[in-house]
Structures are given as C-alpha cells and as structure tokens.
C-alpha cells in the first residue's frame, strides 16, 4: 500500500456512466417514492459493483464513480456549511446543449465541518487492497469561487462577504477542514477538478473579461493563490492532483484553447503533485506549454477521449506521448482519458462496454510505453 501514490501510468479521471439502477433510484427518491436509506442502499450496491470492475480492469485507483452526485462539482459545494442549493432560471451552456439549472448561494460563514463526502470516501476505502488505493475527487476551491460569482450569484456573495479576502480565507479553511478529515479517515489520494483554468484558455472568455476591465493574469493568480491556500499544511504522504477541464457534458464541451495563457502560472506554481490535462483534440493546443511544469511534478496526458466510443489508434497515441516527451521526461508522464465518462447524471454518448474498452486501451498503451 505504501508504494501506491497517484498518479499511475494508466489512470482515469474519476466519474463513470451511471447504471440504470442508480438513475431509477434517484428519480424515485426525488418523487418521494423511496427513502434516503433505500437510495443509499442502491448506491452502495452499484458502487460495490463498479469497484469490482475497476479492480478486474487492473486500476490502481478506485472511486465511487461519482454515483452519489447529480453534478461533478455542485454536490460537493452543497456539503459546506454556509452554502445553499439553489436553482437558476438556466443552466450552463455547452455546444448546442444546456445543462440542468442547479447552482449555489452563500448564506453565511463558509466552513467544512462534517462534510458528507468524508462518509462517501469511507465506503470506498473499505475496498482498498495491496493493488489499489481509494481516491476522492472534488471541485477545486477556485471552482467554488467561480460559482459564487457566476452571473448574478456575485451580488449575493458580495452582500454576505463584503470583505473579499475573508471570503478567500474562509473557502481555503473549509477545504483544509475537509482535506484533514479525509486524511484522518485514511485518504491518501485527492483530485481537484478545475474548469476555471480551461475557461482561462478560451479566447472568448479572455475577450469577455477584458471588456470588463479585468486582467486575465490577475484573476488567474487569485485562483492559484486560493487553491494553494487550501493546500497549506497538507501531509507529505497525501497525493494531491489537479484535473484541468474544458467542460464535458453529454459529449459536448464548453471552452477551447491551448494551455499557453495559464502554463506559467498554474503548471509552475500550483502546489500539487500532478496535472491531468486534456489533449484529446485540437481544442487543447500543442504540448509546448508543458515546458512550464515545475520540476518533480507529473503530467497525465488525456489523449483518449470520453466523448466518443471510437477507439483511438494505438500508434498515433504512442507517437503523441513521445511528442510530449520533448517537453517533459517520459518518467514524469502518464496516460488517461481526457475527462470522466459522466460529469453529471446524464453521462456521455457511449455504452458501459465502450467505456471499459476505452480504459482497456489506456492500459494497453501505457504498458507498451512504460512496461508492465
């Protein structure tokens, strides 16, 4: 167990397609037809089956597939004291699709005591063995800050927190509490999921904030500072990684653009062990920004797409790995899909079998490049 530290040569980002049993049970719970305990029993059963599949696939990380969540990010945010669940009159906009309308509203001092995800983690941890370690995924602190200022949310946030620095400090402290509680529960692998950096890469967003008189570098540095504040004092044996995302809803995307605008900030200065980076299509740009990754940090190349069932050509993927090697040594590189398979309940447009075929391909390529 002591030698298992994320990331792994063949890896995955966290979420899996929701089984129909989960979808049905959640719908029945929402309609008041079953109790919370009955829903939890279904979730436990389906998560157990998922972990069995992860182990059979040879994965060294195990997760709950985010089966207990509606969204990859909001459910975690709703677990903080001082954060309320709300519905907006619209969702997030992707290419040709709109998500459901969930969001958050700050209602008091933000804190992280008794976060429900700690219990979620404990359920997964019981399945650890000498070949696998339980991993907890969560939205990055910067993602919470971005949601608090998403469109009209910012007016309420500023009313509750007129001192912006206090807001940053409270968010960071809340995360430190959750990280501490997870660590005390035995967690040694945490993954931040962070779409803010993918957003910063997008020319449309860059133009939007420029019109508002905001400098991209200033906003990026604030988000970096917040993430690092949340990581202060983390134990040396706790692996913490960041997945940078450009949106992944029902096989669509939200932002585009290479990593050049953020690389000198994020890659050089975020206090994590590794970055999971999307590189599955031209929206992600080239590998040149990898030159900014700080010494000792690893990069997990997201070269296999979860947005399509089509299996990538092995030789082409291997060639791209060696192309990335021009900027970062091969022993600091790993391979994974570019994102999860279901960032929310709806999931991407592929079947359960196609999902596992993708992960099988990741493993086969990794073993060919780095050995078994």
Please place each PLM-identified region on the residue numbering.
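Domain-level signal for soluble alpha/beta catalytic cores
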Residues: 1-372
């Amino acid at each position: 167990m002591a030698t298992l530290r994320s990331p792994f040569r063949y890896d995955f980002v966290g979420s899996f397609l929701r089984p129909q049993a989960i979808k049905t049970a959640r719908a029945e719970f929402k309609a008041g037809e079953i109790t919370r305990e009955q829903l939890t029993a279904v979730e436990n059963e389906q998560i157990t089956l998922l972990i069995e599949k992860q182990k059979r696939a040879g994965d060294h990380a195990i997760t709950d597939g985010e089966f207990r969540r509606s969204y990859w990010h909001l459910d975690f945010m709703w677990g903080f004291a001082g954060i309320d669940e709300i519905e907006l009159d619209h969702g997030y906009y992707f290419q040709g699709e709109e998500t459901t309308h969930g969001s958050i509203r700050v209602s008091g001092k933000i804190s992280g005591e008794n976060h429900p995800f700690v219990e979620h983690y404990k359920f997964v941890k019981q399945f650890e063995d000498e070949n696998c370690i339980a991993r907890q995924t969560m939205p990055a602190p910067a993602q919470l800050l971005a949601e608090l200022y998403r469109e009209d949310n910012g007016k309420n946030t500023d009313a509750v927190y007129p001192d912006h620095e206090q807001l940053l400090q409270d968010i960071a402290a809340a995360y430190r509490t959750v990280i501490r509680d997870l660590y005390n529960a035995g967690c040694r692998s945490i993954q931040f999921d962070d779409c803010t950096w993918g957003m910063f890469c997008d020319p449309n967003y860059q133009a939007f904030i420029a019109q508002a008189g905001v400098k991209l570098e200033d906003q990026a540095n604030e988000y970096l500072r917040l993430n690092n504040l949340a990581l202060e004092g983390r134990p040396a044996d706790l692996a913490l990684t960041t997945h940078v995302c450009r949106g992944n809803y029902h096989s669509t995307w939200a932002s585009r653009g290479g990593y050049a605008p953020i690389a000198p900030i994020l890659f050089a200065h975020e206090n994590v062990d590794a970055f999971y980076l999307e590189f599955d299509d031209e929206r992600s740009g080239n590998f040149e920004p990898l030159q900014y990754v700080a010494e000792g940090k690893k990069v997990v190349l997201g070269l296999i797409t979860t947005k399509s069932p089509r299996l990538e050509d092995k030789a082409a993927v291997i060639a791209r790995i060696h192309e990335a090697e021009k900027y970062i040594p091969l022993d600091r590189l790993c391979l994974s899909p570019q994102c999860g398979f279901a960032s929310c309940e709806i999931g991407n447009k592929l079947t359960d079998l196609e999902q596992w075929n993708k992960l099988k391909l990741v493993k086969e390529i990794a073993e060919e490049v780095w050995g078994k």
